[in-house]
Amino acid sequence: MAHLDLESLPIIGEQKVASLLKWQPLIDTTENALKEFSAGDVVQPVRQIVPVPGRNAIFAAMPAVGTAMAVKIVTLYHDNAGTALPTHQGVILVLDKDNGSPLALLDGRLITEMRTAAGSAAVARRLAPVSVDVVTIMGNGVQAGAHVDALAEVRKWKELRVWARNETKGRQFADRVGARFFQDAEAAVRDADIVACTTAAKEPILRGAWLKPGAVVTAVGWNTSDGRELDDDAMANTVIVESFDAARDQSGNVRGSNCEIFAEAGEIFSGLKSVPDGATVIYDSVGIAIMDVAAAKLVYDLWLPKQEGRRPDAPRKARK
């Protein structure tokens, strides 16, 4: 009976992922994955979250089958912030959809970082004003930086603003990305065309009363049901999510406000639904597995042709 030699399973580490994964292809891939999901062409359970006893942490499994098939195993350890370890760590196992064979194991930290910001950029590309004067980043961590990079791929702006709960780190981040730091959150948000909320705040940091009509807000920082970044007034706007089921089950912004969800992002991208003219849009993201699966498959497909002595269409060998 043949079986796979798992010792030969390719491992694609973060450095290699970084060399292969570029923003524009990833933004396009993420948009297509969300369209595929909303069209009903993805089999995916709601993310399975397991609290880690005695730790300020969770462990999660995120499988999905769409055009590609993979599963992400991820941990979120909040107390790693400020240490040598990242708060998010994970791996993604890409599988052959035709025969179930493992194809490669990929580092999941950078893919998670980039696909999250790519989702925001895809929404901003579709819904943000064509002419953008002000972009505000709320936060100073990994997602704050990723959002600066991703949003720069889809819009040019005149002013970049930063607000953060930690003033020292916020100022350092603002200096690094060429932004103006604001001590006052309201002042930072007023008149902004795009606002990216990327914090781990459990209580609202953004109030709807501050928002410019027609602004696009991307909220990605707190993705479990026991915390929220946006208040009820903010969530009373036109709310877009990746998945109705995932948002209702795991979004603190949605659950805490009991808001109406207007559409899934994939429905907007495919033209099934249209945002009303002049609407203020809230993209509330919890992250869904098909985004990781699509990003990982993109990396794998870019990596495979570069391997010496292996044809891009060659199957992995089984050992007898």
Where do the protein language model's features map onto the residues?
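N-terminal ligand-binding/catalytic initiation module
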Residues: 1-113, 121, 131, 290-293, ...
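Adenosine-phosphate binding glycine-rich loop
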Residues: 16-18, 224-320
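Short helix-loop-beta connector
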Residues: 127-134, 156, 212-213
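Glycine-rich Rossmann-fold phosphate-binding loop(s) that bind the pyrophosphate
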Residues: 140-141
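N-terminal Rossmann-fold NAD(P) dinucleotide-binding loop
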Residues: 144-145
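NAD(P)-binding Rossmann-fold cofactor-contacting core
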Residues: 153-176
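Rossmann-like adenosine-cofactor binding region
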Residues: 179-256
